[in-house]
Design a protein with these regions (language model features):
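Conserved Ig-like domain signature around the intradomain disulfide
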Residues: 34, 112-120
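Short edge beta-strand/loop segments characteristic of extracellular beta-sandwich folds
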Residues: 35-41
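N-terminal edge beta-strand
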Residues: 9-34
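Extracellular beta-strand/loop-rich beta-sandwich domains predominantly from IgSF
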Residues: 73-111, 122-124
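Cleavable N-terminal signal peptides of Sec/SRP-targeted secreted and luminal proteins
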Residues: 1-11
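Core motif of extracellular immunoglobulin-like domains
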Residues: 38, 49, 116-118, 158
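N-terminal V-set
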Residues: 43-85
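Extracellular/luminal immunoglobulin-like beta-sandwich modules
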Residues: 117-142
Length: 158
């Protein structure tokens, strides 16, 4: 009696970006909000949005939003850098074949000018993480008026 073995090779569902920023610049205005959108496909487990490492910008060092497959931000607010607490939000829509993640930074300041990154982690433990970076350029300035002659406080000029 002959025995036959059938070897079935299934290619893993690799993940990829469909709309990478590829380190391009996006302009945000002081006092306004800016939203970054990434579209992707494959077996993506988590989507992480964060600050690019200043020494090696291809790495994300400060996590701002951490979205699970169920669109739940599982990052404890206490882990978000102080300067960003209460000013960031993220959502994830779609399924394993095609998804989108949107991240919003509210009340932009000049200090927000830097690289931000989106990191996709695969469902497959043997899969590779991929990331994409975007540079936020901030425009606008504050003008401080004389309190005696022109009113109170600072006024935003954009």
């Amino acid at each position: 009696m002959k025995s036959y073995f059938l070897l079935v090779c299934v290619e893993g569902q690799s993940i990829r970006f469909h709309s990478p920023y590829a380190k391009k610049k996006v302009t945000g205005r002081i006092g306004h909000s800016v939203t970054f959108v990434w579209k992707f496909s494959g077996g993506v487990h988590t989507v992480i949005w964060g600050l690019a490492n200043k020494k090696s910008i291809d790495r994300i060092s400060g996590r701002l939003v951490y979205l699970s497959r169920r669109n739940v931000d599982v990052l404890s607010p206490g882990l978000v850098p102080v300067a960003y607490r209460g000013r960031v939000n993220g959502t994830r829509t779609g399924d394993s074949s095609f998804s989108q993640a949107s991240f919003t930074l509210y009340n932009v300041t000049k200090d927000d000018e830097r690289f931000y990154g989106c990191l996709l982690t695969p469902v497959d433990p043997d899969g590779l993480e991929i990331s994409d970076l975007v540079k936020l350029a901030v425009v606008g300035m504050y003008i401080y008026r004389d309190l005696k002659t022109q009113g109170r406080g600072r006024h935003l000029v954009t």
